[in-house]
UniProtKB/Swiss-Prot annotation:
It comes from the Bacteria. This is Large ribosomal subunit protein bL25. Part of the 50S ribosomal subunit; part of the 5S rRNA/L5/L18/L25 subcomplex. Contacts the 5S rRNA. Binds to the 5S rRNA independently of L5 and L18. PANTHER family: RIBOSOMAL PROTEIN L25/GLN-TRNA SYNTHETASE, ANTI-CODON-BINDING DOMAIN-CONTAINING PROTEIN (PTHR33284), RIBOSOMAL PROTEIN L25_GLN-TRNA SYNTHETASE, ANTI-CODON-BINDING DOMAIN-CONTAINING PROTEIN (PTHR33284:SF1). GO terms for molecular function: 5S rRNA binding; structural constituent of ribosome. It comes from Albidiferax ferrireducens (strain ATCC BAA-621 / DSM 15236 / T118) (Rhodoferax ferrireducens).
Length: 223
């Protein structure tokens, strides 16, 4: 993806506030063996770009002062309750240095799998992104995962996924985590049904234990 940024001359809280009033967002670009540079970006263009998955996970082309820079989005500061981007950080990319990034997983085909189609199960997406290590030219926007082979009682692990060339998964603790689990629909709904039946069952002892109204004393006989 490509976007345009401009060099920002004035710095400081007051200058940034005035910049936002004019519809621009302050930011910074750093790394890559060069000095950090203050920048500004059109707020509306940045707002729409942030809605795209690739803007968060891919190497971006930033045009700054007529020159193209390869950068990564590193941080976005949002206003606590307004639809306003307060500040944005980018990191320059060195073509010879490997990147440590999070890449989204795009699942597909589960509706055609035996587990979902004929065995009464659903596919539970346990993990939706993984951390990877790769060169900038090898960084994928996403990793496609085919679930059409899922069967009842099975799970899909990280080791079952073919990663793109030059991409290595980074894991912590569990070296082969579960990405997708297969859940039987009836088993998933059973606890809900039992929980709903509990108040009815509890009502029975209460009704049984309710005291009968006291009988009236017989009227005294006239002498």
């Amino acid at each position: 993806m490509k976007f345009v940024a401009f060099e920002r001359a004035k710095q400081g809280t007051g200058a940034s506030r005035r910049l936002r009033i004019t519809g621009r967002t302050p930011g910074i670009v750093y790394g890559g063996g060069a000095e950090p540079q203050q920048i500004e970006i059109d707020h509306n263009a940045l707002w729409h770009a942030l809605k795209k998955e690739a803007f968060h996970a891919a190497v971006l082309d930033m045009e700054l002062d007529g020159k193209d820079n390869k950068v990564l989005l590193r941080d976005v500061q949002m206003h606590p309750f307004k639809q306003l981007i307060l500040h944005v950080d980018f990191q320059r990319v060195d073509a010879s240095t490997r990147l440590h990034m999070k890449v989204p997983l795009h699942y597909s085909g589960d509706e055609n799998s035996p587990a979902v189609k004929t065995e009464g199960c659903i596919a539970n997406h346990v993990i939706t992104e993984i951390e990877v290590l790769c060169l900038p030219t090898d960084l994928p926007e996403f990793i496609a995962v085919d679930l059409s082979g899922l069967k009842k009682g099975a799970s899909l692990h990280l080791a079952d996924v073919a990663l793109p060339k030059g991409v290595t998964a980074v894991t912590r603790g569990n070296k082969n985590p579960v990405l997708v689990s297969v859940v039987v629909i009836g088993a998933a709904e059973a606890p809900v049904a039992e929980a709903g039946a509990a108040p009815v069952a509890a009502a029975a002892p209460a009704a049984a234990g309710k005291a009968a109204p006291a009988a009236k004393a017989p009227a005294a006989k006239k002498k």
